[in-house]
């Protein structure tokens, strides 16, 4: 019962994020959040432990972190450019090509969102809105403006940060009441 409750509240937080982002973070002339950021932040919220009545967004999900670190170590993680350019269907199991595993893009999206929201906090409200003003197909350029360095440089640094990241003790706490 406890596991089912955790899963339910995790899914609820994930889907609530999508509803919030669609209604509050879509600029009037924009296209909403890029799929990698929308799915990544939804996962950050989904796995955030509840501690003293507050969500701990700074606690890396141990299972996602371990899986992402294995992908990076084994060279199976998709390049960041591919994840940044991916459409929403890349994150859905039934729509990915046979050569792609959507869970890999999903894990990378989680790692990117966690890094940009927590480890290297760059996701100020204005930055999130700017990322959603896309639609011109230049996702990599918008990302480079956000992080302030070329994607290749960021990717090397990000991979090192993810490899060195350890889950906090709070991450072992239930993500739901």
Say what each PLM segment does.
Residues 7, 11, 29-176:
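Acidic/His/Gly-enriched intrinsically disordered linker/tail segments
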């Amino acid at each position: 019962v406890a596991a089912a409750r955790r899963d339910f509240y995790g899914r609820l937080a994930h889907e609530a994020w999508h509803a919030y982002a669609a209604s509050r973070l879509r600029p009037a002339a924009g296209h909403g959040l890029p799929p990698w950021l929308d799915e990544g932040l939804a996962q950050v919220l989904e796995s955030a432990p509840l501690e003293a009545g507050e969500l701990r967004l700074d606690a890396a999900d141990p299972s996602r972190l371990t899986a992402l670190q294995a992908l990076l170590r084994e060279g199976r993680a998709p390049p960041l450019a591919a994840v940044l350019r991916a459409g929403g269907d890349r994150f859905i199991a039934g729509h990915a090509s046979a050569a792609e595993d959507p869970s890999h893009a999903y894990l990378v999206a989680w790692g990117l969102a966690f890094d940009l929201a927590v480890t290297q906090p760059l996701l100020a409200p204005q930055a999130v809105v700017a990322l959603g003003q896309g639609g011109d197909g230049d996702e990599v350029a918008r990302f480079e403006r956000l992080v302030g360095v070329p994607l290749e440089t960021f990717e090397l640094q990000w991979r090192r940060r993810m490899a060195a990241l350890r889950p906090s003790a709070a991450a072992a706490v239930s993500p739901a009441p």
